[in-house]
Curated annotation (Swiss-Prot):
Gene3D superfamilies: 2.60.120.200, Cadherins. The lineage of its organism: Eukaryota, Metazoa, Chordata, Craniata, Vertebrata. The gene is CLSTN3. This is Calsyntenin-3. Glycans are attached at N299, N327, N347, N507, N740. SMART domains: CA (SM00112).
Length: 956
C-alpha cells in the first residue's frame, strides 16, 4: 500500500511545481489608444478596441486577463474587463463628462493577468499604454447676448456704415456649436440692417422731426442653428443736427464719505461740430456756502477742535453767550448755525463795548490787554450793503490799550471787498500804519474764518486757513489820533480826539447804544467765535488745522497734463479754471477734475456744481458757443461709528473693600471699541432662510471720544454714605473736565479711546464705614463728535457683602430672611468666620442656593422649637413667682413670655456642621472655603460654651 501511495505523491508534487512556473509571460496591449466620448455620455469608443493578449493562454489564470488599471491624476474614467479569456475590455466615464469643463483627457492604461491561481499570486502586468479621449460636443447651449439692451445715437440726415455692433456668445466647446453664424432683426418694417457679425446700419436717412427713438429686437443663431434663448433689445436715438456742447456727463454725482478723490466728469467730452478752436477756457464752480460755515469742516466743537489741532490755551472770548458775567452781548440778535455755534447779527446801528479788567473782562486790568503780539480770530459773513456807499468803512473791532509808555491803538475794518488793519504803536509819538487786503471773501456774503497775527511790524491775515500778505501798506500820518483811554469795542469805533469833549458826558451804556456824536463806522453783518489771544501767536499749521475747508475741487493729474494746459485752483478750492488749445487734451484734463472731502464723517447733502466754458475760434464769424453745464454732488450719509462698551456687568465685594480709602473700581476690565458697519453685496448662493435684505460687515477703526458719563440707575448717591472717586490730576494733565455730582459723573474733552479706557478703569465707588447699602447699579455711556454719535449704555451692578455680626436687630424672633442675603450671607453663628468664603463664592449656583435655603430653614425651625422648649422649661421653673409683667390669665397658661432680652444658647459647631453637610451635598469642589472655615472653627467656642446670638436688622 505504501508503494502505491509514493508515486501519487510524487505526481502531485510535480504538478504543483509545474503550476507555479506556468505564468511566464506578461499581458500585451497596444501602445496607444484614441477614444471618443459623447458629452453627457459614459461609454468611450476606442480605436483600436481594447484587447489584452497573454502568451500563457489557454492556461487558466496565467493566460487570463483579470483587469485593467488606469494611471493619472483625477482621471474621470474607469476600465472594466468584459471577457477574461479574450482579454476584451471597456473604458467608460465614471459620470457623464462635460466638454465645456475639459475637452480632452490623457491617461495611461495597464493590463494584468490572473496570476498562477485563484489567489492571484505572481500576477504579471503589461506595459503602460497611452489613452487619448476626446469629448465630443453636443449643442446644448444657446447663444447669449453680451448685453440685454444696446443703445446708440445718430445724427439726423446721415447714412452710417455702422451704428453699433451687437454681440452674442455661445457656451459650447466645439467650433461648430460655439460660433455665431448669423444675426436677425425680428421687428418688421425697421429702417435698419444687420450683418452676420452683428453690425447694424441704417438703410435710409433718419429725421429728428420724424421718429426720434427706434426700438427693435435682434436674435442670434449658432452654427448648429440654435436660436438665442433671450433676444436683445436695441434702441437708436435720433439727434438733431450737431450743436456744440459738453457730452457724456451726469447731472447727479454721488460721493460716499471716505472715498477720497472722486472724478466729477470721467466721461465728458466737448462736441465742437468740427469747428476748429485755438483756445478753450472752462471754470468749474463748487457751491458749499450752505454747508455749516461756508464749507464742510470738522464736526467737533471749537474747544475740542483746538485741542486736536494742538492750539495753545489762553484765548479770550469777546462775544460769549449772554449771561450774568457777559451782559455786554445781551442787546445783540442771537442766531445758531448748523453746528450749534453762537452767531451774532450786527444790523449797522449796534455795537458792544467789552469791559476791561475784572472776572468778566479781558485780563485782570488794562495793563494785561493786547500788546504788539496777539492773534485775533473770528467768523464773519459780510456782503456789500446796497443802501450804503462804497466809500463807507465798517468797523469790526476797535481797541485802545494803555501800556507803560502810553497808549496804543488798533482797528480792523472792512471797506467793500477790502479789509484793513490800522495799528498805532504809540499815540504820543509813533505814526499809524495801515495794512490792506483785497479779498473776494470779504464781500461775497458767505461765511469765512479770519485770523490775524500781529507781530509788529509783521502782520499776516489767514482766511479759511490760507495766509495772505498785505496788498498795500500805508503810512497814515494825517489821521486824528483816538482818545487816550482804554476801550474795546466790537461792531463800531468811537470818534477821534476832537470829539472827546462831547463824549465826556456819555456813559458806556449810551456809547454802546450808538450815540451819533461818539460812535461811527457801524458794522453790518454776522460775527461768531470772536476771540483774542495776547502774548503768543497761533502758528500757521494750527490755524490751517482749525479752519481750513475739508472739501473742495481737486486736481492731481499734473504728470499727464498735456502741453499748453493750465490749471488754477482758488485758495478755498471752490473754483477751478482750466485753459488749453487742444480739444482732446482739454477733455483729458477735465476728466480728472475731482471732488474730495477729507472728513471721515462728512456732512451729507447737495453741493451744486457749475461748468462754464468760453472758446475762441479761428473764424470769428462761425465761432461756436458752449452752453453752461449744471449738476450737483450728493454727499451720502456716512456710516455711523458703533461705539461699544463692554466688561464685567456684575460683581460682589465685601463691604470692607468698599470702605477702603480708594474704594472699589467700577470698570476694572472695561473695553471700548469703535467700528463702522457698512453694507456689502450678498452672495447669490448664500444659504439663508428668508429674504436677505441687508448684509453688513464691521471694520474696527481708531477713533476719539469727547465725553463719558457715569450715572446712577435708581436713587442718587447719598454724599454722607457713598461717593464716586476719580483722579483729577490725570484728567487735568490731559486737558479733560470733570463734573461730579450726586446724580452723575461726567468727563468732557476729546481724547483717544485708549486714554478714556485708562481713566474709566480708575473710576471707583466708595462707601462710608458702616453704611448699610447692599446693591447699586451704575450706567456708563460715551459719545463722540460733539455728541453726534453715542455708545451703548453699559450697566454695572455692584453687590456689597456685609458680615451679619456687624449689625444688631431689635427683634427677639429669628426668621429665614435674617439668615439669608442676596449676597449669600453665612449663618449668624459663623458670621465672624466666613467673610473670605462669602467673597470668593458670592455667585453660588441656583441648585446649591436652594439646598442652602432649605438647610437654613431647617435650622431656623430647630431654633424655634428650641425657643418653645426653653419657654416651657422656664415656666415650670418660675412657677408662680414669675417675672413682673407676666401673663396671669389662667385660661392660656402657654402664652407666657419673658419681656426681658431673649438669650438663646446653641451649639455653634453643630449648626455649622449641619449647614456644611447641606452645602457639601449640593456643591462639590469647595475645598478652599472648607479649609478656611475649618481653620477658623478651631478658634470658635467649644460645645459647652454659651454664645449670645443677636438678630440683624431687617434692611429689605
Amino acid at each position: 500500500m505504501t508503494l502505491l501511495l509514493l508515486p501519487l505523491l510524487l505526481a502531485s508534487l510535480l504538478a504543483s511545481c509545474s503550476c507555479n512556473k506556468a505564468n511566464k509571460h506578461k499581458p500585451w496591449i497596444e501602445a496607444e489608444y484614441q477614444g471618443i466620448v459623447m458629452e453627457n455620455d459614459n461609454t468611450v469608443l476606442l480605436n483600436p478596441p481594447l484587447f489584452a493578449l497573454d502568451k500563457d493562454a489557454p492556461l487558466r489564470y496565467a493566460g487570463e486577463i483579470c483587469g485593467f488599471r488606469l494611471h493619472g491624476s483625477g482621471v474621470p474614467f474607469e476600465a472594466v474587463i468584459l471577457d477574461k479569456a479574450t482579454g476584451e475590455g471597456l473604458i467608460r466615464a465614471k459620470e457623464p463628462v462635460d466638454c465645456e469643463a475639459q475637452k480632452e483627457h490623457t491617461f495611461t492604461i495597464q493590463a494584468y493577468d490572473c496570476g498562477e491561481g485563484p489567489d492571484g499570486a505572481n500576477t504579471k502586468k503589461s506595459h503602460k499604454a497611452t489613452v487619448h479621449v476626446r469629448v465630443n460636443d453636443v449643442n446644448e447651449f444657446a447663444p447669449v447676448f453680451v448685453e440685454r439692451l444696446y443703445r446708440a445715437a445718430v445724427t439726423e440726415g446721415k447714412l452710417y456704415d455702422r451704428i453699433l455692433r451687437v454681440e452674442a456668445i455661445d457656451g459650447d466647446c466645439s467650433p461648430q456649436y460655439s460660433q455665431i453664424c448669423y444675426y436677425e432683426i425680428l421687428t418688421p418694417n425697421t429702417p435698419f440692417l444687420i450683418d452676420n457679425d452683428g453690425n447694424i446700419e441704417n438703410t435710409e436717412k433718419l429725421q429728428y422731426s420724424g421718429e426720434r427713438l427706434y426700438k427693435f429686437t435682434v436674435t442670434a443663431y449658432d452654427c448648429g442653428k440654435k436660436r438665442a434663448a433671450d433676444d436683445a433689445e436695441v434702441e437708436i436715438q435720433v439727434k438733431p443736427t450737431c450743436k456744440p456742447s459738453w457730452q457724456g456727463w451726469n447731472k447727479r454725482i454721488e460721493y460716499a464719505p471716505g472715498a477720497g478723490s472722486l472724478a466729477l466728469f470721467p466721461g465728458i467730452r466737448l462736441e465742437t461740430c468740427d469747428e476748429p478752436l485755438w483756445n478753450i477756457q472752462a471754470t468749474i464752480e463748487l457751491q458749499t456756502s450752505h454747508v455749516a460755515k461756508g464749507c464742510d469742516r470738522d464736526n467737533y466743537s471749537e474747544r475740542a477742535l483746538r485741542k486736536l489741532c494742538g492750539a495753545a490755551t489762553g484765548e479770550v472770548d469777546l462775544l460769549p453767550m449772554p449771561g450774568p458775567n457777559a451782559n455786554w452781548t445781551a442787546g445783540l440778535s442771537v442766531h445758531y448755525s448748523q453746528d450749534s455755534s453762537l452767531i451774532y447779527w450786527f444790523n449797522g446801528t449796534q455795537a458792544v463795548q467789552v469791559p476791561l479788567g475784572g472776572p468778566s473782562g479781558l485780563g485782570s486790568g488794562p495793563q494785561d490787554s493786547l500788546s504788539d503780539h496777539f492773534t485775533l480770530s473770528f467768523w464773519m459773513k459780510h456782503g456789500v450793503t446796497p443802501n450804503k456807499g462804497k466809500k463807507e468803512e465798517e468797523t469790526i473791532v476797535c481797541n485802545t490799550v494803555q501800556n507803560e509808555d502810553g497808549f496804543s491803538h488798533y482797528s480792523l475794518t472792512v471797506h467793500g471787498c477790502r479789509i484793513a488793519f490800522l495799528y498805532w504803536p504809540l499815540l504820543e509819538s509813533a505814526r499809524p500804519v495801515k495794512f490792506l487786503w483785497k479779498l473776494e471773501q470779504v464781500c461775497d456774503d458767505e461765511w469765512h474764518h479770519y485770523a490775524l497775527n500781529l507781530e509788529f511790524p509783521t502782520v499776516t491775515l489767514y482766511t479759511d486757513g490760507i495766509s495772505f500778505d498785505p496788498a498795500l501798506i500805508h503810512d497814515n500820518g494825517l489821521i486824528h489820533p483816538p482818545r487816550r483811554e482804554p476801550a474795546l469795542m466790537i461792531g463800531a469805533c468811537w470818534t477821534e480826539e476832537k470829539n472827546k469833549e462831547k463824549e465826556k458826558g456819555d456813559n458806556s451804556t449810551d456809547t454802546t447804544q450808538g450815540d451819533p456824536l461818539s460812535i461811527h463806522h457801524y458794522f453790518h453783518g454776522y460775527l461768531a467765535g470772536f476771540s483774542v489771544r495776547s502774548g503768543r501767536l497761533e502758528s500757521r499749521e494750527v490755524i490751517e488745522c482749525l479752519y481750513a475747508c475739508r472739501e473742495g475741487l481737486d486736481y492731481r493729474d499734473f504728470e499727464s497734463l498735456g502741453k499748453g494746459m493750465k490749471v488754477h485752483v482758488n485758495p478755498s478750492q471752490s473754483l477751478l479754471t482750466l485753459e488749453g488749445d487742444d480739444v482732446e487734451t482739454f477733455n483729458h484734463a477735465l476728466q480728472h477734475v475731482a471732488y474730495m472731502n477729507t472728513l471721515r464723517f462728512a456732512t451729507p447733502g447737495v453741493r451744486p456744481l457749475r461748468l462754464t466754458t468760453a472758446v475762441k475760434c479761428f473764424s470769428e464769424e462761425s465761432c461756436v458757443s458752449i452752453p453752461e453745464v449744471e449738476g450737483y454732488v450728493v454727499v451720502l450719509q456716512p456710516d455711523a461709528p458703533q461705539i461699544l462698551l463692554s466688561g464685567t456687568a456684575h460683581f460682589a465685594r465685601p463691604a470692607v473693600d468698599f470702605e477702603g480709602t480708594n474704594g472699589v473700581p467700577l470698570f476694572p476690565d472695561l473695553q471700548i471699541t469703535c467700528s463702522i458697519s457698512h453694507q456689502v453685496e450678498a452672495k447669490k448662493d448664500e444659504s439663508w432662510q428668508g429674504t436677505v435684505t441687508d448684509t453688513r460687515m464691521s471694520d474696527e477703526i481708531v477713533h476719539n471720544l469727547d465725553g463719558c458719563e457715569i450715572s446712577l440707575v435708581g436713587d442718587d448717591l447719598d454724599p454722607e454714605r457713598e461717593s464716586l472717586l476719580l483722579d483729577t490730576t490725570s484728567l487735568q494733565q490731559r486737558g479733560l473736565e470733570l463734573t461730579n455730582t450726586s446724580a452723575y459723573l461726567t468727563i468732557a474733552g476729546v481724547e483717544s479711546i485708549t486714554v478714556y479706557e485708562e481713566i474709566l478703569r480708575q473710576a471707583r465707588y466708595r462707601l462710608r464705614h458702616g453704611a448699610a447699602l447692599y446693591t447699586r447699579k451704575f450706567r456708563l455711556s460715551c459719545s463722540e463728535m460733539n455728541g453726534r454719535y453715542s455708545s451703548n449704555e453699559f450697566i454695572v451692578e455692584v453687590n456689597v457683602l456685609h458680615s451679619m455680626n456687624r449689625v444688631a436687630h431689635p427683634s427677639h424672633v429669628l426668621s429665614s430672611q435674617q439668615f439669608l442675603h442676596r449676597g449669600h450671607q453665612p449663618p449668624p453663628e459663623m458670621a465672624g468666620h466666613s467673610l473670605a468664603s462669602s467673597h470668593r463664592n458670592s455667585m453660588i449656583p441656583s441648585a446649591a442656593t436652594l439646598i442652602i435655603v432649605v438647610c437654613v430653614g431647617f435650622l431656623v425651625l430647630m431654633v424655634v422649637l428650641g425657643l418653645v422648649r426653653i419657654h416651657s422649661l422656664h415656666r415650670r421653673v418660675s412657677g408662680a413667682g414669675g417675672p413682673p409683667g407676666a401673663s396671669s390669665d389662667p385660661k392660656d397658661p402657654d402664652l407666657f413670655w419673658d419681656d426681658s432680652a431673649l438669650t438663646i444658647i446653641v451649639n455653634p459647631m453643630e449648626s455649622y456642621q449641619n449647614r456644611q453637610s447641606c452645602v457639601t451635598g449640593a456643591v462639590g469642589g469647595q475645598q478652599e472655603d472648607e479649609d478656611s472655615s475649618d481653620s477658623e472653627v478651631a478658634d470658635s467656642p467649644s460645645s459647652d460654651e454659651r454664645r449670645i446670638i443677636e438678630t440683624p436688622p431687617h434692611r429689605y
